[in-house]
Curated annotation (Swiss-Prot):
GO terms for cellular component: cytosol. Mg(2+) binds at H545, V548. CoA binds at R193, R194, G195, K196, T313, S529. The keyword Phosphoprotein does not apply. The gene is acsA. It comes from the Bacteria. Catalyzes the conversion of acetate into acetyl-CoA (AcCoA), an essential intermediate at the junction of anabolic and catabolic pathways. AcsA undergoes a two-step reaction. In the first half reaction, AcsA combines acetate with ATP to form acetyl-adenylate (AcAMP) intermediate. In the second half reaction, it can then transfer the acetyl group from AcAMP to the sulfhydryl group of CoA, forming the product AcCoA. ATP binds at G389, E390, P391, D413, T414, W415, W416, Q417, T418, D506, R521, R532. Acetylated. Deacetylation by the SIR2-homolog deacetylase activates the enzyme. Its cofactor is Mg(2+). This is Acetyl-coenzyme A synthetase. The modification N6-acetyllysine is found at K619. It comes from Wolinella succinogenes (strain ATCC 29543 / DSM 1740 / CCUG 13145 / JCM 31913 / LMG 7466 / NCTC 11488 / FDC 602W) (Vibrio succinogenes). Gene3D superfamilies: 3.30.300.30, N-terminal domain of ligase-like.
């Protein structure tokens, strides 16, 4: 899939713009200049307006230990109270969460009901599982409301939650439990996917087998699909049997603005996943502010983000952001094509969804598999469409804009990351003329620049490093337990005025208007269906197969997923030159990847090769392999390779 970008601009819908929070580019420019002229004043004003402080902050920003920035120093708050307690006077009977299961079961949970459910859950964690402020709790759950209950309950009592995507393997789950030194695992028996039950509890059992996670004291299980599970007496407890016995009185714990709120593990360019640490005040401020600015959600709107709570998009734009601003957020358990490709459009019609936020992968899939399906449904309540996780190609953009949005809904093509906490570059739906496939302009207060390593701006049309040159409140605070890796991962590539700045890992191009187009990763991370996978992590998994001598993994462009995994594999003696065995090897190696990481990381293509292109110092030249995988001309200098002839040999096999 080649990424070509239109130069045509789509102006905001005038009727929409009249009632938008930011109505035109002049208002955007005023906010941008406010941040430029009085940086701390800009953020301090937002924090005072939007957060219900238990104690006021004394200092907006402390840069004394940069890049370990501290925001809203001295302030105290509770994120759960920000999401629930403060809405009870005016919104107690408003729907907070609308849940639909894949089999069609549904629940509407009001703010009052959610408030009481979360307080009971918080008491259960405190009283029965001895979870205290600062303890880590791993949540390995499907897309059901109880996942949100658990996150908010942790926030209420000051525990640090770490949600692990339910598609990850036992090994991946174990690694995250060990790194976080978690006290408790919360899971479900299972859930439903593609109309069938799938299991989560056995994965937890495997992760904890043979005392592999000594920090874990107990396992709390939510019963969802009622399939038979293994029950370990003294360790395993059923949430559904215990929650009704708990009191609904649980005052929120006052938390320092810089206390950790959650950890979320993300792939890095080295093998070990990074525990991205987000803290209290800055995170919730930007989650709420971007909900208001980017989606322009109004009091009576229904908002739906199709992500999973196991990813940052689910944290910020299913749970924390919508609830902090008092919105109605939709949660859906299953896949977009069950029982057919009209499932999402049927839900948009039924729940009268006004803002819809999804990944380009899903749009491409539905465009390919059910192009005419949207015509069967009334989608006229939609006001804003959004995309997240990867760049969107113009064909998919045009179908989304015309067929789903009826040519009336602005598309907010949002660029941000696990590490940024919330949107960084995005159109504002009432203000920004939209360019298909382009993230457009940095949000007010965000100083995103396309520069070289020394901080010099790249000329218009020329690719450079996408860097954020000033701190922002929702930024990553640390990599859990590894401050050196935090500095080396994010602040060692680029400088501005001699000072290290945050490098996002992405390349970008800025045009004459100042619009920013993301060109893709500049490090060894693959973006599959909007999910980041580290090449080193996949390579480590493949290397565990006894027949593999050496491997290198790169990305290949994919029409549906954006990128797919392409593995070049050197086999050990005795495994080569046997076609029948090679087919079996392909299955076995993907089984290893699934076991070690999860099915998302499986290689779509494997090529058995006699060797890999290496420099004389032993470094594998992945850019050459990426060019081969994508069928591109090799422009890199191969004369410095240890064996220049290996490139031609690999090309012939590919």
């Amino acid at each position: 899939m080649t990424q070509t970008h239109s130069t045509e601009l789509f102006k905001p819908n005038r009727a929409f713009a009249k009632t938008a929070r930011i109505k035109n580019l002049c208002e955007y420019e005023d906010l941008r200049l406010d941040a430029e002229e009085d940086f701390e004043g800009f953020w301090g004003k937002l924090a005072k307006e939007k957060i219900d402080w238990m104690e006021p902050f004394s200092k907006v920003l402390d840069e004394s230990e940069a890049p370990f920035y501290k925001w809203f120093v001295g302030g105290k708050l509770n994120v759960c109270a920000q999401c629930l307690d403060r809405h009870l006077d005016t919104r107690k009977n408003k729907a907070a969460i609308i849940f639909e299961g894949e089999l069609g079961d549904s629940r509407i949970i009001t703010y009052r009901e959610l408030f009481y459910e979360v307080k009971r859950t918080a008491n259960l964690l405190k009283n029965k599982f001895n979870v205290k402020k600062g303890d880590r709790v791993v949540i390995y759950m499907p897309m059901i409301p109880e996942a949100a209950f658990m996150m908010l309950a942790c926030a209420r009592i000051g525990a640090i939650h770490s949600v692990v995507f339910g598609g990850f393997s036992a090994e991946a789950l174990r690694d995250r439990i060990i790194d976080a030194e978690a006290k408790l695992v919360i899971t479900a028996d299972g859930a439903y996917r593609r109309g069938k039950p799938y299991m989560l509890k056995p994965v937890v059992d495997d992760a904890l087998a043979e005392g592999a996670c000594p920090s874990i004291e107990k396992v709390l299980i939510v019963i969802r699909n009622k399939e038979e599970i293994n029950y370990v007496p003294g360790r395993d407890y059923i949430y559904n049997e215990m929650i009704g016995l708990e009191s609904a009185h649980c005052p929120p714990e006052p938390m320092d603005a810089e206390d950790p709120l959650f950890l979320l593990y993300t792939s890095g360019s080295t093998g070990k996943p990074k525990g991205v640490q987000h803290n209290q005040a800055g995170y919730i401020l930007w989650a709420q502010t971007t909900m208001e600015w980017v989606f322009d959600v109004k009091e009576n709107d229904t908002y739906w983000c199709t992500a999973d709570v196991g990813w940052i998009t689910g944290h910020t734009y299913i749970v924390y952001g919508p609830l902090a601003m008092g919105a109605t957020t939709v949660m859906y358990e299953g896949v977009p094509i069950y029982p057919d490709t009209g499932r999402w459009w049927k839900m948009i019609e039924h729940y009268r969804v006004n803002q819809f936020y999804t990944a380009p992968t899903a749009i491409r899939l539905l465009h390919k598999e059910g192009k005419e399906e949207p015509k069967k449904y009334n989608l006229s309540n939609l006001k804003v469409l959004g995309t997240v996780g990867e760049p969107i190609n113009p064909d998919a953009w045009n179908w989304y804009y015309n067929e789903i949005g009826g040519g009336q809904c602005p598309i907010v093509d949002t660029w941000w990351q696990t590490e940024t906490g919330g949107h960084m570059i995005s159109p504002l739906p009432g203000a920004t003329p939209i360019k298909p496939g382009c993230a457009t302009l940095p949000l007010p207060g965000i100083f995103a620049e396309v520069i070289d390593e020394e901080g010099n701006p790249k000329p218009a049309g020329e690719q450079g490093y996408l860097c954020i040159t000033k701190p922002w409140p929702s930024m990553i605070r640390n990599i859990w337990g590894d401050p050196k890796r935090y500095e080396s991962s994010y602040f060692s590539t680029c400088k501005k005025n001699g000072k290290p700045v945050y490098f996002a890992g992405d390349g970008a191009i800025r045009d004459e208007r100042g619009y920013i187009t993301i060109t893709g990763r500049m490090d060894d991370v693959i973006n599959v269906s909007g999910h980041r996978l580290g090449t080193a992590e996949i390579e480590s998994a493949i290397a565990k197969h006894p027949g593999v001598a050496e491997t290198a993994v790169v990305s290949r462009l994919d029409e549906i997923k954006g990128e797919s995994v392409y593995a070049f594999i050197v086999l050990k003696p005795g495994y080569e030159d046997n076609v029948a065995e090679e087919l079996q090897l392909l299955k076995e190696i993907n089984a290893v990847i699934t076991r070690e990481i999860g099915p998302l990381a499986k290689a779509d293509t494997m090529l058995f090769v006699p060797g890999l292109p290496k420099t004389r110092s032993g470094k594998i030249m992945r850019r050459i392999l990426r060019s081969i995988a994508r069928g591109e001309e090799i422009t890199q200098d191969t004369s410095t390779l240890e064996d220049p002839a290996i490139v031609q040999k690999i090309q012939q096999l590919a």
